[in-house]
């Protein structure tokens, strides 16, 4: 179980700086009202500041908050006065106001102490949430909060934490342009999962493997529960953020052992992945490592799209977390539509992924092909048959897959696209054989680009994205090369050789065992 989950009815683990506090008495005593600081009090507070922190760095609101907290939690007041802000759970600074009166001062106002000021080297990492508040406070929406909680409605930084008075951390408003949470509406919608009829031996083997390995609803629910729990944790640092499940867990091509991809969205605008995203992920990596007992082996990987990899001890699932890589949200629903538009697509793609994984072709971190690239290659093959099995959805339904569509519409737009009725009735076994043959001897790797967007092979241009690349697979939305990880001639030759070997073996034997020990894989998967 997740120790901080409110659904479990448990009090979260106390923070290191917390002390057990007696419960607040439900009496008729007068609520504590903020009192202005007397000169001698202010002097006493200032004397507690370290030499490296100038008194003007603390705003009047912080002094008011400290004076109130002094009556309720001595340890917390001492922590604030000693400027030990790293121990304070990060909370985005809200506007300050007294009930119905106008705000005293706004953190965004020119007079705010932290505005337009670089952090000095001797200040350490003081209040990084304030420094990074541009990621947390949307410009189009203003949320009013009660700045000084009274005794009857003291806020807590962590749900259920006992007697730890802080500024109330509000429920974050939904950012404009974001898709709904995966657990809210569409995640468990019924989709047509009718399988094709298999008459030959090879097609039956493919279907049997698919039915044993495909992701189950229970697997998806476990991942989504962890996503929801992590979203609550991350919103303690970035209150305006939303966390989305993307990739194979949602696009229909996942297996029971598939990793789960998460996209943390902080703002609508594109984010610099080299600077902003890395900074945010470094904060989250530290938070996961030090605060979350159910997160195991968090790793911060500084790739082109940086991620934090970790394992959830509760579900046993592996997760990859990125920040603001919103193209992943768009292509998740594009691929999901392809997955269910024709009933041969999912079984074929799954067996291709299992074959590639078994032979070491499915690991972008080791210079081979990512799962996403393999899916695009399979879809491209089905589009380029003399009688296509699937069309280009972006050409046939451009209004549903517009790259400029607001994110909150992305999941809804393709839901009413009907099944594609192809005249091509080729069985699964022949489609698998044709896929291997196409990339073994027919596709021109040196001259062509694989394009699902155009449903054909495009001639290579001299653009930097395609120049001197061994394999070129176009991302349907941002049109980058999803196969850029294959940058070594040795790895490219290995991939081509395996396609050729697999095609010859399957052509001669017409048995899935010639590609991989599929029954052993099924047995191993069922034991998980």
From Swiss-Prot:
Gene3D superfamilies: 1.10.1410.10, Beta Polymerase, domain 2. Residues 16-32, 102-113 have a biased composition (Low complexity). Residues 428-481 form the PAP-associated domain. GO terms for biological process: mRNA processing; negative regulation of miRNA catabolic process; oogenesis. Keywords: ATP-binding, Cytoplasm, Developmental protein, Differentiation, Magnesium, Manganese, Metal-binding, mRNA processing, Nucleotide-binding, Oogenesis, Transferase. The keyword rRNA-binding does not apply. It is an enzyme of class 2 (transferase). One of its GO terms (molecular function) is ATP binding. Pfam families: MTPAP-like_central, PAP_assoc. Residues 1-41, 99-121 are annotated as: Disordered. Its EC number is 2.7.7.19. GO terms for cellular component: cytoplasm. It is found in: Cytoplasm. It catalyses: RNA(n) + ATP = RNA(n)-3'-adenine ribonucleotide + diphosphate. Cytoplasmic poly(A) RNA polymerase that adds successive AMP monomers to the 3'-end of specific RNAs, forming a poly(A) tail. In contrast to the canonical nuclear poly(A) RNA polymerase, it only adds poly(A) to selected cytoplasmic mRNAs during oocyte maturation. Plays a central role during oocyte maturation by mediating polyadenylation of dormant mRNAs, which contain 5'AAUAAA-3' sequence in their 3'-UTR. In immature oocytes, polyadenylation of poly(A) tails is counteracted by the ribonuclease parn. Component of a complex at least composed of cpeb1, cpsf1, tent2/gld2, pabpc1/ePAB, parn and sympk. Following oocyte maturation, parn is expelled from the complex. Interacts with rbm9 and sympk. This is Poly(A) RNA polymerase GLD2.
